[in-house]
Amino acid sequence: MAEMMGGITGWFVADKIVAYLFIVLFIWGASNKFGKKGEFNDDFTSLDNMKSLQGFAALGVILHHISQEYFFQEEGVLSLFVNAGAYFVALFFFCSGYGLIKSLDTKKDYLKGFIGKRVVKSLVIPFYVNVILYGLMMFIVKWPLEPLQWVTNFLGITMMNRYAWFPIVLAILYVVFYLHFSNIKNRKICFVAIGIFIICLGIHTCICGHVAWWAGPDNWWMDDNFWETDFKWWMDEQIFWFNGEWWANSAPAFLTGLIFANYEKKIVAFFKKKYALKLHILIVITLLLGMLNNYGQAEFGYWTEWEGNGPAIGDKIVTYFTQIPLLFVFPLLVFVIMMKYHVSNPVSRFFGKYSLHTYLMNLAAITMCRFIEVPDALVMVGDVKNNLFIFAIAVIVLSVLLGMLEHKITTAVQNLIYRKPAPVAVATYVRPSLLEADGEHTTKTSLAAEIKSDDVADKKAEEKKDRS
């Protein structure tokens, strides 16, 4: 027994407890139709449930970013979330694609003013508000940036916040959606064209790699001497757009959302017949695609620059193509499950409301809290693992607070730019119909009729008197 328990530490248990608590969130406020034959959740794609799902995804992304910190990986804490980021982001992309088609089908002239409302107001303004906030924080703490980098960061050409890639990619996909659906009537052609664009976007990230591999001699990023003598700031990791596979590897889910929304009735009707059998088949397919993805990651991989064979773009592209099917199908599996089981609780709704902003401010929170994480820092809370626990809690809380602040600032900027002109008051008289007349109006008109009748009678009496 002692030997069996020898590998189990307090932090092993704590790690599992964190995973358990995250799972508990999927039970609290659940609507469960499993075990009830022929019964389904008719509201599984409602706005409230979509927002709750995005809330879970936002919290998952925060935990994913925390789990990727060096000491967390060393200690194996939050290991469940290390490679889960792409799945959480895929849910965001799916919901975005789904919402576009539903809005297109239900809102009159939806594409009129689309770029201004859905791209500039909803994505570009939040992005640049975030750029300014990060710039102010970097200026306050005297973050060492080259003068040119300050300029390119504020312009958005290079990344002030390396986590802020999502609104950029989503804005690009929105523009692509608008260009296709405003000019092409055949939706199938639109879906195919958007799918091709998404694949090309992923290939482009594979070509870009993680560093400016094209800017120096072969494998310069592995040469310590080059870093000390010839390295320029713009050659570093994640400086330019698309420096990283995460920019596009989850984007196929956007296409899934478009297609699901367009054929929702047919898809739902299909899965309602023999639901249990089809759900299990879909689960098996997803697991097989997961194995294909794992094979691609293990045999080829995205981080090929550090194998000493140059950027190895071909290996990246192969890895990308082994991942596309999984991230296309995974959101479908989630929503087929939601036909029978979905969750909405205060935590999920809260994170759903602030999902974009907690995500955008997450890097700032992580950076501010790193003094807790590093064991040889001046400020010590306890041993390394105690520090990691406090670090994780602090990052979540600070991400929420900073996200709420950014949301408030962004909303104020949006209202300032897009405020509607005050309505001009025009005094007009509208003659109500008899059916619209209320009691007061009826009384007034009756009284006026009586006064007018009396006046006519008096006038006739006076005329009669004059004649006589």
Where are these regions (language model features)?
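Soluble or luminal CAZymes and related metallo-dependent hydrolases
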Residues: L111, P167, A171-I172, A248, ...
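Membrane-cytosol interface segments of multi-pass membrane proteins
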Residues: M1-I203, C208-G209, G216-D223, Y354, ...
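Membrane-interfacial loop-to-transmembrane-helix junctions in polytopic alpha-helical membrane proteins
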Residues: G7, D42-N49, E74-F81, W234-G244, ...
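Alpha-helical transmembrane segments of multi-pass integral membrane proteins
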Residues: W11-I23, T286-Q414
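Short glycine/serine/threonine-biased micro-segments
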Residues: C95, L255, F350
